[in-house]
């Protein structure tokens, strides 16, 4: 009885549908077009298991959130990587189409992107949609950062594009928008045929999300536009503090258009091994970063990722410590990362 309550919590799904329609303009049926999952991690895994067969191929833009490759492989499919080329993280339509010529069944699109902060333009999304329609495939979207977008950029919903209503499978989460990462509340929005499969997979993966947390989160889903405006302004402030600090230090970075990550180019320091460099950075400079190579399929070792969703005091202290980076590098001598 409790499991059935979790699966069929109509209040939560009604609230998801209403919010999604408000921002995307798309009306969805809470009963037949939404499945509630234990976070977007399960949403993506359940989706991949629902739409792929063993040896199917799935297109993934690189750099990418590491789960995408793992989810594809765990579902028995094979990833095909298409590069987003720094510093603007543009992609080649020819390379994208070549990936689909290999028989790709779907493309995973993280928009805004983790780790590079790219927000795909209308023209880019339309180009992707045209290729997907041409090869009769799906787009699986990860839109967890939909409300963390920096002006003048705008988040555009793939499902709202012409001909993409039935071809788009939306994976989303409440974690980032409402700062409730530990609650593990996510959802899938798709056409009824896909949702019917996702429901079955979801039942065997986790059975259901926590009913009390769904009831509590329903309140958040009903917040008015003022909340989302304030959220965007709050993240824009954090970006200004940290990325503005990087600018003052003269460090080379790619300006994030959305999400709360920034990739910094450390090639000026002669970095050959970004993993070793990040270990050294934490130990000798006192600032933590993630090696960029963990997100790229390509041989990229000159980028590191910083996360700036922190209090001002923490961000300012990080910038103060990074101010000593060049001096620390000069005094480092013979280090493993060079």
Q: Where would I find each of the regions flagged by the language model?
A:
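Long amphipathic alpha-helix in the N-terminal Rossmann-like dinucleotide-binding domain
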Residues: 8-14
């Amino acid at each position: 009885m409790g499991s059935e309550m979790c699966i069929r919590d109509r209040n939560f799904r009604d609230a998801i549908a209403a919010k999604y329609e408000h921002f995307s303009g798309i009306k969805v049926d809470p009963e037949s077009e939404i499945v509630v999952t234990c976070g977007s991690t399960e949403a993506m895994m359940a989706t991949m298991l629902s739409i792929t067969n063993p040896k199917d191929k799935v297109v993934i833009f690189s750099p990418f959130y590491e789960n995408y490759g793992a989810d594809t492989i765990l579902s028995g499919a094979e990833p095909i990587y298409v590069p987003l080329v720094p510093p603007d993280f543009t992609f080649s339509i020819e390379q994208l189409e070549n990936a689909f010529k290999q028989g790709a069944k779907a493309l995973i699109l993280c928009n805004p992107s983790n780790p590079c902060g790219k927000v795909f333009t209308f023209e880019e999304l339309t180009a992707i949609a045209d290729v997907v329609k041409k090869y009769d495939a799906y787009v699986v979207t990860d839109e967890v950062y939909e409300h963390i977008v920096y002006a003048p950029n705008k988040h555009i919903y793939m499902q709202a594009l012409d001909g993409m209503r039935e071809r788009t499978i939306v994976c989303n989460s409440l974690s980032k928008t409402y700062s409730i990462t530990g609650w593990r509340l996510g959802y899938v929005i798709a056409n009824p045929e896909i949702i019917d499969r996702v429901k079955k997979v979801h039942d065997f993966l986790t059975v259901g999300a926590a009913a009390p947390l769904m009831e509590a989160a329903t309140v958040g889903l009903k917040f008015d536009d003022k909340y989302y405006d304030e959220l965007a302004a709050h993240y824009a402030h954090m970006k200004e503090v940290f990325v503005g600090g990087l600018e003052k230090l003269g460090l080379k970075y790619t300006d994030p258009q959305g999400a709360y990550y920034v990739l910094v180019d450390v090639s000026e320091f002669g970095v050959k091994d970004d993993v070793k460099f990040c270990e050294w950075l934490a130990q000798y400079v006192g600032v933590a970063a993630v090696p960029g190579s963990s997100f790229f399929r390509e041989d990229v070792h000159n980028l590191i990722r910083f996360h700036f969703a922190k209090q001002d005091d923490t961000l300012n202290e990080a910038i103060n410590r990074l101010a000593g980076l060049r001096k620390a590098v000069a005094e480092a001598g013979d280090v493993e990362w060079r």
